[in-house]
Every structure is written in structure tokens, then in C-alpha cells.
UniProtKB/Swiss-Prot annotation:
GO molecular function per UniProt: large ribosomal subunit rRNA binding; structural constituent of ribosome
One Pfam family cited in the UniProt record for this chain: Ribosomal_L11
Oligomer status and interactors: Part of the ribosomal stalk of the 50S ribosomal subunit. Interacts with L10 and the large rRNA to form the base of the stalk. L10 forms an elongated spine to which L12 dimers bind in a sequential fashion forming a multimeric L10(L12)X complex.
Lineage: Bacteria, Pseudomonadati, Pseudomonadota, Alphaproteobacteria, Rhodobacterales
UniProt keywords, alphabetically: Methylation, Ribonucleoprotein, Ribosomal protein, RNA-binding, rRNA-binding
Protein's name in the database: Large ribosomal subunit protein uL11
Gene Ontology CC: cytosolic large ribosomal subunit
Stated role: Forms part of the ribosomal stalk which helps the ribosome interact with GTP-bound translation factors.
GO process terms (BP): translation
Gene behind the chain: rplK
Post-translational modification: One or more lysine residues are methylated.
Top-rank lineage group of the source organism: Bacteria
Length: 141
């Protein structure tokens, strides 16, 4: 018999830095998920990623207190800010420029994000990343 799914939980946890402190601990604890088991499994799965990169994580938890997790790649905005060497996007994106990135950097970001994007090919993924850059006030050269 299959395990009965109780619900799902979406968290954004820094890669390699999952610990029982807020916001991770309380969110998992109130749903009956073993916090230390999650932290160990998450940190092991994100060991090859850059430490501290925000990882959107979808946790499905079951009636027998077990869980599965799907760890996605960091958001496009994280990669764009890193490539442009800025802390945040522009306050007025259509009028201000927060930074600049090259088309090669956009392609690199699109290749890294390809599995999480709703695109058929790399050109479609690049268009999605270009739209994110435009909305953040990052100029593409």
C-alpha cells in the first residue's frame, strides 16, 4: 500500500546551512517532520552547491512521518545579482540600471537553470532569464 500524503511545504533554505533554528525548525516541527533527519539529508544533497545559495525546496510529508524533498536550483535573481556583482536590483527598473551582464553570462545562467525552467531549448531559457534581468533593472550587453 502506498504512503498517504498529508501535505507539501515550500521553503527556501540556504544550501548546506539547514539547521533546526527558525524558520526551518518550526515549519517542519509543527508538521511532525523529523527536523534533524531533514537537516542532514538536505545538507548532504546540497553539498556540491555553493554554500549559502538559496535553494527552493518542496517537501512532501506523509502520514508515517516520512518525507521526500525536491531541491530546485537557486532563483534566477540570485545568479543575476552574482553575475552583475550587485546586492539588489534597481528601485525603478525601467529608469535605473542596477548593473550589467553579458549575453554569455545569461547563457551560462540559462544552462544552470534549464531543468527548472519551462522552456524547450536554451534560447527559450535565455529569454526567460533576460526577462528577469530586465525586471531587476540589469542591462544586458
Amino acid at each position: 500500500m502506498a504512503k498517504k500524503l498529508i501535505g507539501t511545504l515550500k521553503l527556501q533554505v540556504p544550501a548546506g546551512k539547514a539547521n533546526p533554528s527558525p524558520p526551518v525548525g518550526p515549519a517542519l516541527g509543527q508538521r511532525g517532520i523529523n527536523i534533524m533527519e531533514f537537516c542532514k539529508a538536505f545538507n548532504a544533497k546540497t553539498a556540491d552547491m555553493e554554500v549559502g545559495a538559496p535553494c527552493p525546496t518542496v517537501i512532501s510529508y506523509y502520514q508515517d512521518k516520512s518525507f521526500t524533498m525536491d531541491i530546485k536550483t537557486p532563483p534566477a535573481s540570485y545568479f543575476l545579482k552574482k553575475a552583475a556583482k550587485i546586492q539588489s536590483g534597481a528601485n525603478k527598473p525601467s529608469r535605473e540600471t542596477a548593473g550589467t551582464v553579458t549575453v554569455a553570462q545569461i547563457r551560462e545562467i540559462a544552462e544552470a537553470k534549464m531543468k527548472d525552467l519551462n522552456a524547450n531549448d536554451i534560447d527559450g531559457a535565455m529569454q526567460i532569464i533576460l526577462g528577469s534581468a530586465r525586471s531587476m533593472g540589469i542591462e544586458v550587453k
